[in-house]
Each structure stands twice: as C-alpha cells, then as structure tokens.
Amino acid sequence: MSHYTLGWHDQQNKHYEIGEYADDAFEAVKHAREDVPYLHEHPFSLDSIKKEQ
C-alpha cells in the first residue's frame, strides 16, 4: 500500500489536495471521490496524482 497525494481545482480555481493510501492510483482516485463530495460531483476535476515515496 502506498500514499498518494491528489490535487484538484474547484470552480473558483482554488487548489485543494487530499492524501490517500491505496494499492494503486486508480484506487486512490476512487477513495478520494468517496471522501470528497466535490470530487464525487465533479469526477474529472482532478488534475494531479502523485505517489509519495
């Protein structure tokens, strides 16, 4: 399991990040969309996924 940092911008162009633990990036995105209502409503607003070392 690895730590991922996911970033996105809202409609006011404010940048946000969330950290998720997951087996891969796809699972990290799934968890982020479950945890953040905005990402659930706007699933394509994610603009970065970084696997932390």
Listing of model-derived features with the role each one plays in the protein:
Residues 15, 34-53:
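Short, mixed-charge low-complexity intrinsically disordered segments
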